[in-house]
C-alpha cells in the first residue's frame, strides 16, 4: 500500500475466543464475513502501533465473527490486541455496482438542492434499517434519506457534488 493511499476502517478486535489465539471481531462490512475478502489488513492498536497482516482467516461462530491471525497462537497476545482497528486500502475494495456507493466515498462531498441552494458537506452516513441517511453539515445539520432517485438526484465525484430534491428549510 502506498503511504498516501486512503484507508477504510472495516472493523475492530473486541476480544479473545478460546485459548489458541483466535480473536472476536466487530465487522462493518456487509455481510459481516466479507471483511476476510479484503486484504492485506492494516491493524492499528489503541496506542497507535501499526502492522500489516495478510492471510487472515475467519468464520462466523454464532453471534461472533472469529479470526485467526498468522503467527498468533496464544490468548495473552490476543487480549493485548483488544480495541485494535482493522483497515484496508481503498483499492482493496471492489468497484461499487451502478447506483451503489461506499459511504466513505460520499463523505466530504458538497450537497446542494436541485434549485442550486448549497446545503453543506457530507459529514457521515448512518443506517436506519429501512434506508441510509446522509448527514449534511452547513449553516446547520440536516439529515437527508439517501434514497435514489426520490431524494438523491445525482452523485458526481468529478464535481465533488451530490444534488438532492430537498427543502432547504427542512
From Swiss-Prot:
Family annotation (Pfam families)? PRC_RimM (PF24986), RimM (PF01782)
Q: Which residues form the PRC barrel domain?
A: 98-170
Q: GO MF annotations for this entry?
A: ribosome binding
Name a single GO cellular component: ribosome
Protein location: Cytoplasm
User: Does this entry carry the keyword Chaperone?
Assistant: yes
Keyword annotations for this protein, in alphabetical order, are:
Chaperone, Cytoplasm, Ribosome biogenesis, rRNA processing
Give the record's GO biological process terms: ribosomal small subunit biogenesis; rRNA processing
PANTHER family in UniProt: RIBOSOME MATURATION FACTOR RIMM
The record's HAMAP family line, in alphabetical order, gives:
Ribosome_mat_RimM
Family label: Belongs to the RimM family.
Subunit? Binds ribosomal protein uS19.
What is the role of the protein in this entry? An accessory protein needed during the final step in the assembly of 30S ribosomal subunit, possibly for assembly of the head region. Essential for efficient processing of 16S rRNA. May be needed both before and after RbfA during the maturation of 16S rRNA. It has affinity for free ribosomal 30S subunits but not for 70S ribosomes.
> Domain comment, in the record's words?
The PRC barrel domain binds ribosomal protein uS19.
Q: State the protein's name.
A: Ribosome maturation factor RimM
| High-level lineage | Bacteria, Pseudomonadati, Pseudomonadota, Gammaproteobacteria, Lysobacterales
